[in-house]
Amino acid sequence: MKISDLDTPVLMIDEAALDRNIARMKDLTSEAGVFYRPHAKTHKSVEIARRQIAAGAVGICCAKLGEAEVMAAGGIDNILITTAVVGESKVGRLIHARNSARIAVVADNADNIAMLGNVAQMSGQKLDVLVEVDIGQGRAGVPAAAEAAGLAKLIHDHGWLNFAGIQGYQGKIQM
Protein backbone atom coordinates (compact mmCIF):
# COMPACT_ATOMS: atom_id res chain seq x y z
CA MET A 1 0.00 0.00 0.00
CA LYS A 2 1.22 3.48 -0.82
CA ILE A 3 0.80 6.40 1.55
CA SER A 4 -1.38 8.09 -1.06
CA ASP A 5 -3.80 5.14 -0.81
CA LEU A 6 -4.53 5.76 2.88
CA ASP A 7 -7.88 7.23 3.83
CA THR A 8 -7.17 10.51 5.60
CA PRO A 9 -6.95 11.77 8.18
CA VAL A 10 -4.79 8.93 9.44
CA LEU A 11 -2.35 8.61 12.29
CA MET A 12 1.04 7.28 11.31
CA ILE A 13 3.88 6.67 13.74
CA ASP A 14 7.51 6.17 12.87
CA GLU A 15 8.18 3.46 15.44
CA ALA A 16 11.94 3.75 15.16
CA ALA A 17 11.76 7.48 15.89
CA LEU A 18 9.31 6.87 18.74
CA ASP A 19 11.61 4.30 20.32
CA ARG A 20 14.63 6.62 19.90
CA ASN A 21 12.77 9.47 21.58
CA ILE A 22 11.65 7.28 24.47
CA ALA A 23 15.21 5.97 24.91
CA ARG A 24 16.59 9.53 24.78
CA MET A 25 14.24 10.64 27.54
CA LYS A 26 15.26 7.66 29.64
CA ASP A 27 18.93 8.51 29.11
CA LEU A 28 18.45 12.20 29.97
CA THR A 29 16.60 11.46 33.19
CA SER A 30 18.97 8.66 34.19
CA GLU A 31 21.97 10.95 33.70
CA ALA A 32 20.26 13.59 35.85
CA GLY A 33 19.35 11.03 38.51
CA VAL A 34 15.64 11.84 38.41
CA PHE A 35 12.45 9.92 37.86
CA TYR A 36 10.13 11.00 35.10
CA ARG A 37 6.43 10.80 34.39
CA PRO A 38 5.63 11.75 30.78
CA HIS A 39 2.37 13.43 29.89
CA ALA A 40 -0.01 11.43 27.73
CA LYS A 41 -1.90 14.48 26.47
CA THR A 42 -0.03 14.43 23.18
CA HIS A 43 -0.25 10.76 22.24
CA LYS A 44 -3.30 9.66 24.30
CA SER A 45 -2.18 6.11 23.59
CA VAL A 46 -2.11 3.25 26.07
CA GLU A 47 0.44 1.43 23.88
CA ILE A 48 2.84 4.40 23.84
CA ALA A 49 2.35 4.84 27.60
CA ARG A 50 3.28 1.17 28.07
CA ARG A 51 6.46 1.69 26.05
CA GLN A 52 7.37 4.74 28.13
CA ILE A 53 6.85 2.85 31.38
CA ALA A 54 8.79 -0.18 30.10
CA ALA A 55 11.66 2.23 29.41
CA GLY A 56 11.67 3.52 32.98
CA ALA A 57 8.92 6.11 33.38
CA VAL A 58 7.33 5.84 36.84
CA GLY A 59 3.87 6.40 35.41
CA ILE A 60 1.89 8.68 33.15
CA CYS A 61 0.33 12.13 33.51
CA CYS A 62 -3.15 12.77 32.17
CA ALA A 63 -4.79 16.17 31.84
CA LYS A 64 -8.31 14.96 32.62
CA LEU A 65 -10.14 12.24 34.48
CA GLY A 66 -11.45 10.81 31.19
CA GLU A 67 -7.91 10.32 29.90
CA ALA A 68 -6.93 8.66 33.19
CA GLU A 69 -9.91 6.30 32.90
CA VAL A 70 -8.75 5.19 29.45
CA MET A 71 -5.18 4.64 30.66
CA ALA A 72 -6.36 2.72 33.75
CA ALA A 73 -8.68 0.54 31.65
CA GLY A 74 -5.70 -0.19 29.40
CA GLY A 75 -3.58 -1.43 32.31
CA ILE A 76 -1.56 1.68 33.15
CA ASP A 77 -1.41 1.49 36.94
CA ASN A 78 0.34 4.71 38.04
CA ILE A 79 -1.36 7.91 36.90
CA LEU A 80 -1.24 11.57 37.90
CA ILE A 81 -4.19 13.73 36.84
CA THR A 82 -2.60 17.14 36.31
CA THR A 83 -5.71 19.31 36.52
CA ALA A 84 -8.08 19.46 39.45
CA VAL A 85 -10.87 16.91 39.50
CA VAL A 86 -13.88 19.06 40.35
CA GLY A 87 -17.56 18.25 40.63
CA GLU A 88 -19.65 15.63 42.33
CA SER A 89 -20.40 13.92 39.01
CA LYS A 90 -16.76 12.90 38.76
CA VAL A 91 -16.53 11.39 42.24
CA GLY A 92 -17.89 7.98 41.27
CA ARG A 93 -15.76 7.88 38.16
CA LEU A 94 -12.60 8.66 40.14
CA ILE A 95 -13.43 5.97 42.71
CA HIS A 96 -14.07 3.43 39.95
CA ALA A 97 -10.83 4.26 38.12
CA ARG A 98 -8.91 3.90 41.38
CA ASN A 99 -10.02 0.26 41.56
CA SER A 100 -7.56 -0.62 38.79
CA ALA A 101 -4.82 2.01 39.12
CA ARG A 102 -2.98 4.15 41.61
CA ILE A 103 -4.22 7.63 40.71
CA ALA A 104 -2.87 10.82 42.23
CA VAL A 105 -4.55 14.19 41.78
CA VAL A 106 -3.78 17.89 42.21
CA ALA A 107 -5.64 20.51 44.23
CA ASP A 108 -5.31 24.24 44.71
CA ASN A 109 -8.07 25.05 47.21
CA ALA A 110 -9.54 23.79 50.47
CA ASP A 111 -12.96 22.94 49.01
CA ASN A 112 -11.39 20.64 46.43
CA ILE A 113 -9.26 19.01 49.12
CA ALA A 114 -12.38 18.33 51.20
CA MET A 115 -14.13 16.75 48.19
CA LEU A 116 -11.07 14.60 47.47
CA GLY A 117 -11.02 13.49 51.10
CA ASN A 118 -14.63 12.35 50.72
CA VAL A 119 -13.69 10.44 47.55
CA ALA A 120 -10.87 8.67 49.35
CA GLN A 121 -13.02 7.81 52.34
CA MET A 122 -15.86 6.47 50.14
CA SER A 123 -13.38 4.28 48.26
CA GLY A 124 -11.68 3.09 51.44
CA GLN A 125 -8.30 3.96 49.91
CA LYS A 126 -6.02 6.85 50.78
CA LEU A 127 -5.51 9.29 47.93
CA ASP A 128 -2.24 10.97 46.96
CA VAL A 129 -2.73 14.71 46.42
CA LEU A 130 -0.23 17.26 45.13
CA VAL A 131 -0.66 20.99 45.71
CA GLU A 132 -0.64 22.86 42.43
CA VAL A 133 1.40 26.05 42.58
CA ASP A 134 1.45 28.94 40.13
CA ILE A 135 5.04 29.34 39.00
CA GLY A 136 4.48 32.62 37.24
CA GLN A 137 2.22 31.90 34.32
CA GLY A 138 -1.03 32.81 36.08
CA ARG A 139 -2.65 29.70 34.66
CA ALA A 140 -3.45 27.52 37.65
CA GLY A 141 -2.39 26.88 41.19
CA VAL A 142 -1.92 28.88 44.35
CA PRO A 143 0.23 31.98 43.90
CA ALA A 144 1.88 32.16 47.32
CA ALA A 145 4.18 29.79 49.18
CA ALA A 146 2.30 30.37 52.44
CA GLU A 147 -0.98 29.38 50.81
CA ALA A 148 0.62 26.27 49.30
CA ALA A 149 2.04 25.33 52.70
CA GLY A 150 -1.40 25.73 54.27
CA LEU A 151 -2.97 23.43 51.69
CA ALA A 152 -0.16 20.91 52.16
CA LYS A 153 -0.89 20.88 55.89
CA LEU A 154 -4.61 20.46 55.22
CA ILE A 155 -3.86 17.43 53.03
CA HIS A 156 -1.34 16.04 55.53
CA ASP A 157 -3.77 16.37 58.42
CA HIS A 158 -6.64 14.66 56.58
CA GLY A 159 -6.98 11.01 57.52
CA TRP A 160 -7.70 9.83 53.98
CA LEU A 161 -5.23 11.95 52.01
CA ASN A 162 -1.47 11.73 51.52
CA PHE A 163 0.48 14.87 50.72
CA ALA A 164 2.46 13.76 47.65
CA GLY A 165 4.31 16.98 46.80
CA ILE A 166 3.79 20.01 44.61
CA GLN A 167 3.18 20.49 40.92
CA GLY A 168 3.84 23.55 38.80
CA TYR A 169 3.32 24.05 35.10
CA GLN A 170 5.29 26.43 32.93
CA GLY A 171 4.04 26.12 29.39
CA LYS A 172 6.88 28.18 27.97
CA ILE A 173 9.40 25.59 29.14
CA GLN A 174 8.91 22.54 26.96
CA MET A 175 11.29 19.67 26.45
Regions found by a protein language model. Give the residues of each.
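Active-site-proximal beta-alpha core segment in soluble small-molecule metabolic enzymes
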Residues: 39-175
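N-terminal glycine-rich anion-binding loops that anchor highly charged ligand groups
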Residues: 17-48, 61-63
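Short, well-ordered helical secondary-structure segments
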Residues: 5, 23, 27-30, 52, ...
